[in-house]
């Protein structure tokens, strides 16, 4: 699969997969991981994050859980902050931000175990008090791709195949 086909697949999965986690309270996000290769994958997956950080807020650790609710190793890597006065929204509009806001860019790296070839799996992420260190850090961009999604109902389950 080429990069554009993977992006289209991630868009489709983000719209169709049930990204809710039963019994989980609080603010969390779903992480849809796609293995577009012909081999099973065990290793690090990386979500590249670019988000506004409110004035007075500080970066904090994150945690990631499997679809079965097992917490897995996860670390924030390559964290960088810069002042920002406005933010471009997904629809292309620009929203002014309060004084003191910052842009936070980082890589959310987490461990994926045994993701079958040409399959996807949904993980849950949330802010945390601590991180579980990864057994190894990625030296190159992993072959799997990750898309963040807000929790919503969908007709597809937490893991499945494609193509």
Task: Describe every region a protein language model picked out.
Residues 1-163:
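Carbohydrate-active enzymes and regulators
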